[in-house]
């Protein structure tokens, strides 16, 4: 599954380090079909991840393709803001490390016209959706269902993420930084939607600001607004300790935090145990025994 979508990227990264990877260039004739290819690949990746996970009894929601949920099943908007805030901070920190250590990067065409901008936007969307769905959600949930330990899951997921960013050379260390934070956020909430959104806008902003510099200013203000929203939501939940804490989706068998063995982390099993306990308690009360 991973090789189907990322093997070519690993090879391209190696060619980039060797100085042999050609810079993509052209107009609508080249970038138009490439844009369609990126969007098609995105849809296929999500469909395959959902279908293969369903064969293992993991629903799309359990996989993480849904917003963060609170204990009552409602959408946890505050959790989403804080996830995005932490993800953005991780990308900034990781990006700084990569910038300091990188020995190479993917080339870009000298003329960045509308055709290239559209392609870059589609590629950014594909990166956010495909990477977080395959490299994060699908890989982590599969390893957890296989009974692998937390260190094994984290190491494998980070290694997969670093592999197709090999064109940075030593700068790939920065990728490991934000990849680790993304894994923590996913395990903590059981959702990848905020991570997809942040990843898309991070990559997209890098491309857009090269053509429209004012987008960088807008991105800064949006980042500040996100931080404020995250802090306000944290303060609001902290001031109301009586409210149930935000958690992952109730059906997240293999992704909800804390890390546990798959058999013990199945909420449906816990629910059945509680039901049996209540039934036994009622039987004892009917016979005059203490419940």
Regions found by a protein language model. Name each.
Residues 1-57:
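Alpha-helical transmembrane segments in multi-pass membrane proteins
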Residues 18-36, 58-133, 140-146, 240-245, ...:
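Juxtamembrane helix-loop-helix connectors linking adjacent transmembrane helices
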Residues 3-11, 91-99, 158-167, 200-209:
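Aromatic-anchored segments of alpha-helical transmembrane domains
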Residues 130-156, 184-191:
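Membrane-interface helix/loop boundary segments of multi-pass membrane proteins
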Residues 239-271:
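Short, highly charged, low-complexity non-transmembrane loops/tails of multi-pass membrane proteins
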Residues 8, 12-15, 170-229, 233:
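Functionally important transmembrane alpha-helices
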Residues 54-61, 232-252:
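Membrane-interface capping segments at transmembrane-helix boundaries
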Residues 59, 71, 116, 147-152, ...:
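Membrane-helix interface segments
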